[in-house]
């Protein structure tokens, strides 16, 4: 395990990462995500050097590497890369984080029943059965007025300590791009009045409380990570019904019915390597949206000697598609899946998109395993 990485930035990292065998059935989450980032047939950055860090055991059975070590490892990986002889610099490090911290409402991992809700603190005011919101103290009323969800078994868990580790990695030059989460909750800005919104409920006779609009580590708004929400797969360009949203989202990207490589189930590969045992399947989630951004950013970074998290944010700010999403076509309340609530009207776009004929673009060639040079010509051709 990575147990001896130094935090002083002076000594080389020591320790190793070990992986234990696990016979549990996988849902191929990481494989699908990696295929979107850099897969040869369905990915963006087809010539990227790929490195995998197993953050969890078999998804989602639990933490594998301590969250407090993940970002130390990324910092060490980035800071002590071998200098590229072509550029005289270390290559940029673009990372995707399609995972997030969660809390469960109870040990049975069941959805929170409305009957167990004691109160909601919303923008500094406490609401309860004696002081209801405008829509009344009912489940639908609380959802409409305050954006609390009762159909989910868990909520996003933000950690200031982990967020500080993420920021350290960003400050050291690592680009961190991550999924917003799939709770259909607002992710507030730390400076606004929704940051301290909390829910208070009972379980087994004890009172419990959680902030519910702070997002989840590592992609929370109290660090500079790039937070990606999911775009629906309709021509109206609405946000996906499951995605977290709000003022702390940086950009939306396709996240519904995304086709990528899979395990040993799904659609067998009959186009490129029939009989090879390769399979592809579709998946939904902000986990599928985030690697779209990471892949495009990695492709862009191939033309840069230096590429930081700030550079990536700047690119997304300047070159995403603006004001083309459909928001607030319904009531505009928290219970309306089209509500904007401060979300950016902005989604990922590549100016030099894939072929317009055929389902996908044919592979350009096999990825090299040695002799990689940097930088390579970017496949993006954006206009200033």
Stretches with model-predicted labels:
Residues 1-69, 83-94, 103-108, 171-173, ...:
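Subtilisin-like serine protease catalytic core
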Residues 1-2, 6, 174, 201-302:
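Extracellular S/T/G-rich loop segment that most often corresponds to the catalytic His/Ser-adjacent loop
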Residues 11-27, 78, 157-161, 167, ...:
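N-terminal domain-start motif of subtilase-like serine proteases
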Residues 30, 47, 54, 181, ...:
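Residue-level detector of functionally special positions within alpha-helical transmembrane segments
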Residues 34-37, 51-58, 95, 255-334:
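Hydrolase catalytic cores
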Residues 35-42, 210-217, 334-335:
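Intrinsically disordered, low-complexity boundary segments flanking structured domains
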Residues 52, 82-99, 103-108, 225-227, ...:
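C-terminal subdomain of the subtilisin-like protease fold in secreted/lumenal serine endopeptidases
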Residues 56-220, 274-291, 329:
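Substrate-binding/access-modulating region of protease and related hydrolase catalytic domains
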